[in-house]
Amino acid sequence: MITLLTGKKGSGKTKKLIDLVHGAVGTSLGNVVCVEKGDTLTYDVDHKARLVNIESYGIVGFEGLYGFIAGLCAGNYDITDIFVDSTLKIGGKDLNDLLVFLVKVKTMTDGANVNITFSVSADSSEFPEAIFKIAEIK
């Protein structure tokens, strides 16, 4: 399942994401991963979740982000939840590119049985219509 936490900058998406990470850590029977750009969440995310600074791996663009997430899933079948903060800062600002990315991620998550939540700094009214068929918008 794919979930998008949407809203303009400063609307509380990261706080919601942190709360969701903590909830997943408490209920998951597997591993929880939180991906961020930079190291701002170091003291906010529960230590039981694997916090990954994507900049440490030189990942840029939606293709790179897709490959990174696919690698996480392929390398660890115990991952139940992946949370990605600042998705547009990692992948790029083009919402049509986001749609193409989400289509690929949806195909992967359906087979891997992984829940992925992305924070997206954009109002949902700006999204291409097809995104609403792929992801749950919050």
Annotated model-derived regions:
Residues 1-71, 126-130:
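Conserved P-loop
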Residues 3-5, 32, 79-84, 116:
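Generic beta-sheet signal
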